[in-house]
């Protein structure tokens, strides 16, 4: 029970960080807040037995760190995606549901690498949160699931607040 509660605390801290990231004014600031989220969320997933999720998040830390440092290349991104798919498939114990974090991360990796448009990235965050919602409900990470819904809603607010910038980028 203590590990479960600790996992929920880590999940809540991560959720706060990702919510802040959705209001970031630059791609780099968004990525840094997401790295912070990923660290806490990976620990929470490990404590809850969500190994595919923890792996996916760990690779996302590497991806975002390389992007912040401007060291990401198409080759490195491709290698990270392939590793994620292969190792994620190996660790998957949840059938189709276990692939949702992988799908989420691959789609975000491609989006973050191909567009500087924050509004588009916010839409991809919504897609990701909905996939994570299903995964979190499956591993019974209910507070994380509530967080997924909250992040979806806060990101929608950020999209509405910044809708003028969407057409300009």
Question: What are the residue ranges of the model-derived segments?
Answer:
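Alpha-helical membrane-protein topology signature
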Residues: 1-169
């Amino acid at each position: 029970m203590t590990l479960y509660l600790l996992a929920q605390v880590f999940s809540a801290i991560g959720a706060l960080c990702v919510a802040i990231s959705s209001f970031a004014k630059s791609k780099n600031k968004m990525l840094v807040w997401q790295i912070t989220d990923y660290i806490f969320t990976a620990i929470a997933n490990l404590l809850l037995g969500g190994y595919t999720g923890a792996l996916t998040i760990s690779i996302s830390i590497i991806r975002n760190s390389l992007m912040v440092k401007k060291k990401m290349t198409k080759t490195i991104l491709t290698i990270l995606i392939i590793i994620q798919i292969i190792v994620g498939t190996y660790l998957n114990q949840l059938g189709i549901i276990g692939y949702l974090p992988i799908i989420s991360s691959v789609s975000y990796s491609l989006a973050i690498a191909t567009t500087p448009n924050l509004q588009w990235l916010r839409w991809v965050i919504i897609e990701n949160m909905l996939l994570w919602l299903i995964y979190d409900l499956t591993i019974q990470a209910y507070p994380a699931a509530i967080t997924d819904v909250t992040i979806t809603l806060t990101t929608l607010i950020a999209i509405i607040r910044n809708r003028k910038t969407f057409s300009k980028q």
